[in-house]
Amino acid sequence: MALLFIGIDPSTGGGNCPAVWVDQPEGAGAEPELVLQGWLADAAMLERCAQDSPRPDTEAVIRIPARMVKQIREACDVVERSQL
């Protein structure tokens, strides 16, 4: 696993904040993935999200502030460049 740190919530003063990485696995057929750290969704949000996409036990719903769009776009760009 080659984990590339992209950035944290720009309005934070330090640790314990939403963050974005790209996992760039090595090996044939391995595809990169976005790795996101965010706030856990509350029960009401989980219930609403389940209406559109039921969540298995192996997944989590998190919240990430919209001010992190730049970091998420950068992570997406890294993934796209790796697939050229």
Where are these regions (language model features)?
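A short, structured beta-strand/loop element
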Residues: 14-59
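Short Gly/Pro-enriched turn/cap motifs at secondary-structure boundaries
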Residues: 8-12
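Helix-rich interaction surfaces within compact, conserved domain-sized segments
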Residues: 38, 47-84
